[in-house]
Every structure is written in structure tokens, then in C-alpha cells.
A protein has these predicted regions:
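Intrinsically disordered, low-complexity, positively charged segments
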Residues: 1-77
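Short, acidic Gly/Pro/Ser/Thr-rich loop/turn segments
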Residues: 11-12, 109, 120, 155
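Intrinsically disordered, low-complexity linker/loop segments enriched in Gly/Pro
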Residues: 71-142, 147-150
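Single conserved hydrophobic/aromatic residue that forms the stacking wall/gate
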Residues: 162-171
Length: 171
């Protein structure tokens, strides 16, 4: 469980999005970088559709409220826990009382903070992806508590051969 101390840009919960609701005027939403989502899921041995925090801008600071495992993927940021550098595109065990700091995107636009077990977020139309402009979910704010799903089952084995990523552009 994490507490948002500060956010330097925009951040919201995202998963692989919602399909089948365009006829109702609702876009797919979901993570902007499917590969970063799949990478985070692989690092934590969980479903690629697990909810992660998508960070757009310059990251933020998070107080670790209980021991947890996180993964950092997507656009590289400078990352540290209690001022000790953390590798990007890797998983890390954080301890209660640590201060996780993510700053300065080095490349790209979308960074992801994954929590083992996934973040707890409301599911709307089969997805936990926020789409604030449509009134679904909201951007994260200081003092928000980012909790793990209550269902703390053992990690599941995922077959990535069946993971279908959408085509971003065709040639």
C-alpha cells in the first residue's frame, strides 16, 4: 500500500482497457504503452491486465505504508527508495516507511508503477482504467491511498504466447 505524497504531472490507474463499448460512446481507454504493462506483469509474475499506475510527466513521491513489491516500466525515470537508486525495468521490494521517489522522465512519455497483486481500483465496464474526461475514475492526488487488491492470492502463471497486443500502426 502506498500513499501519494506528491504528483508532478498526471497519473491514473490503467489496465489493458475496455473493449466493446464504443457503440455507447465509450473509448477503449487503458494503458498507452501495452508493452510496458506486459513487462511489469512479467516482472511481478501476474496477469498482464493487472491495474498499474500510469505516470505522465515527471513522476511523484510515494510513502510506503506496508511492505510490498513493485515494478517500474515504460519511459525511464530517475527512481529511488530512501535516496538509494532503483533500476528501471526491474522489480523491487519496498519496506514500510520507505519513500519512493520517481522524477525526471529520461525518454518517452508514459511510465508505469506496478504493485504486486495489482492496485485496487473500481471496475467500470470490465476495466479499472480511469478516463476522467468521461467521468470514470480520476487523476491521482496527494494524500490518496493506493491499496493492493484485497484478493492477495498467490501470483498466477501467465502464458504470454496468448497475450495479444493491439496494432498501433500498420504498414
Amino acid at each position: 500500500m502506498l500513499e501519494v505524497v506528491s504528483i508532478l504531472g498526471f497519473s491514473s490507474f490503467q489496465d489493458m482497457g475496455r473493449n466493446g463499448f464504443r457503440s455507447l460512446g465509450l473509448s477503449r481507454s487503458g494503458a498507452a504503452d501495452y508493452y510496458a504493462m506486459a513487462e511489469g506483469a512479467a516482472l511481478l509474475d501476474q496477469s498482464p491486465n493487472s491495474t498499474a499506475l500510469e505516470l505522465i510527466g515527471n513522476g511523484g513521491t510515494f510513502n510506503v505504508l506496508e511492505d510490498c513489491m513493485v515494478a517500474l516500466t515504460g519511459a525511464t525515470m530517475l527512481a529511488s527508495a530512501d535516496q538509494k537508486p532503483l533500476a528501471w525495468n526491474a522489480s523491487h521490494y519496498l519496506y514500510k516507511g520507505n519513500m519512493l521517489n520517481l522524477t525526471t522522465q529520461q525518454n518517452g512519455r508514459y511510465s508505469y508503477l506496478h504493485l504486486r497483486g495489482g492496485f485496487k481500483a473500481p471496475k467500470v465496464f470490465n476495466s479499472c482504467s480511469a478516463q476522467p474526461v468521461a467521468g470514470i475514475g480520476q487523476y491521482t492526488r496527494p494524500k490518496d491511498i493506493l491499496a493492493q487488491l484485497e484478493n492477495k492470492q498467490d501470483p498466477i502463471a501467465v502464458s504470454y504466447t496468448h497475450l495479444t497486443l493491439p496494432t498501433i500502426c500498420s504498414v
